[in-house]
Each structure stands twice: as C-alpha cells, then as structure tokens.
Amino acid sequence: MGLIDRNISFLAVVLLSLSPAQAEDRFEHPPILYSQSTPDNPISQLQSKLKKGQLDWKPEKHTGHLRSLLQALKIDIDSQTLNFAKTSLQGRLISPGRPRALFFNDDIYVGYVNGSQLLELSVADPAMGAVFYSFNQDNQ
C-alpha cells in the first residue's frame, strides 16, 4: 500500500468518525424530552424545600451537610461503599487514600469525597429516568 493509499484510508476513517454524534439528541425525543420536563423525584422535592428555606441544616465539621442530606433522602448511612474509580466529577480528588464514598437506597445514590464541598447525586425519576445533580455545600 502506497503513501497516497494510506493517506486516503486514514482520511476516510477520520471523516467517518467525525459524523455528528446523535447520542445527545435522544434525550430531546419522546418519551424523555429533558429540556421540556420538570423532574419530580425526592431530590427535586428536597431542592424545592431548600430554595424555600424550609430546611434548617447545620453542617458538621468534617462532612458538611452529608448526614442531613442522607437523612432527608432516607438513605441509611450504613449503606456506604467505597469506590476508587475516577469516573466522577471529582475524579482528580479520588485516590486509594481518598476514595469516593457512595451511599444509596433503591432509587438514589449520593457520592461524597472527603475534603470536597461537592456532593454528587443520582436519582431514578419515574418520568425522566436517571437524573444527575450536584450539591455544592459552600452555597448552603
């Protein structure tokens, strides 16, 4: 195979791989329609209460609002499991010495990294499927 043939083959592979990603569009088609939908799940309901000032949470010294959040979402603190994967918004903070703690119940996951002010949440919304949230404890 000559240099020109290899360049044409390479160019064909590159052009084919640059086709528009359609994965994002599927969230805007029925039945999901994310941008037109309003979440109705335990986290969105808790978010509404927080915005209205209906919750009086006192942060703890080392974990911030984690315990209050778990109690409000009815997640047992004993559900904790540790995860070392860096597939997180906080991947740069996660290490063998600082794993991400995951707390969960049947519908909700809460991710916490020691020393971070960000909590990651995922909930199974009945109408929208998996919905992801982040909770910045600095703003509370």
Model feature map: region roles:
Residues 1, 139-140:
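Generic low-polarity alpha-helical segments
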Residues 24-138:
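Extracytoplasmic c-type cytochrome modules immediately beyond a signal peptide or single-pass transmembrane anchor
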Residues 19-23:
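Sec/Tat signal peptide C-region and signal peptidase I cleavage site
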Residues 1-10:
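Bacterial N-terminal signal peptides that target proteins for export
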